[in-house]
């Protein structure tokens, strides 16, 4: 607790002398020991393991920019649930041009009667991200070669797209990579036939790869 200037009352404030002492020790260190974070490791647990106190948990964020920017890695046993919660919708892939149709917020219905709301569309991948109202969307919008669509209320005309692929969002393709791990664009309106040299990376795989990087 500290008094600041002539202000009445006291305020909670971190003990900066403790922080400065640790920062100086880190800055004066000539070497660092590498450690791979294991499932179940927490900052306070590792602080106690290395320093004999839980007080220095924040040093891991200080000296590891990737953790500071992206957060502590998720335990492996929690990762799938985290992925489903982060990407809970359905992904529909179509070769039809959706750039001007299927606006975000539009209600759409497939041949099998499943209805949902367009949350996002990615025309360069031919993808519609649709929320069917379930907490974790498990009800599919139908098999391939069926259609999903809506009625344009201005023109009073039906707008449809043929389903090439449909899956849970977390299992759908986030991007394609070449052999150098670089993102590669697909040929427009031929989204189901990527070059054989390209590797598809799903939302789930991307999160798992990112999580592994945070452990180092």
Positions of PLM-derived features:
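Cell-surface/extracellular proteins and modules involved
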Residues: 1-216
């Amino acid at each position: 607790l500290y008094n600041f200037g002539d202000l009445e009352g006291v305020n909670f404030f971190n003990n900066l002398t403790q922080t400065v002492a640790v920062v100086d020790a880190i800055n004066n260190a000539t070497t660092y020991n590498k450690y791979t974070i294991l499932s179940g490791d927490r900052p306070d647990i590792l602080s106690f393991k290395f320093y004999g106190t839980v007080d220095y948990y924040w040093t891991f964020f200080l000296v590891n920019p990737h953790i500071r920017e992206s957060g502590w890695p998720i335990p492996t046993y929690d990762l799938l649930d985290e992925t489903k919660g982060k990407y809970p919708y359905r992904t529909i892939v179509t070769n039809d041009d959706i750039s001007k149709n299927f606006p975000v917020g539009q209600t759409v219905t497939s041949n099998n009667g499943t209805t949902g709301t367009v949350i996002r569309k990615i025309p360069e991948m031919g993808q519609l991200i649709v929320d069917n109202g379930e907490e974790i969307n498990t009800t599919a919008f139908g098999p391939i070669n069926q259609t999903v669509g809506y009625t344009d209320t201005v023109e009073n005309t039906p707008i449809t797209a043929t389903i090439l692929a449909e899956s849970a969002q977390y299992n759908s393709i986030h991007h394609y990579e070449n052999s150098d791990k670089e993102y590669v664009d697909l040929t427009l309106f031929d989204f189901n036939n990527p070059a054989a040299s390209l590797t598809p990376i799903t939302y789930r795989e991307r999160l798992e790869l990112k999580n592994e990087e945070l452990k180092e």
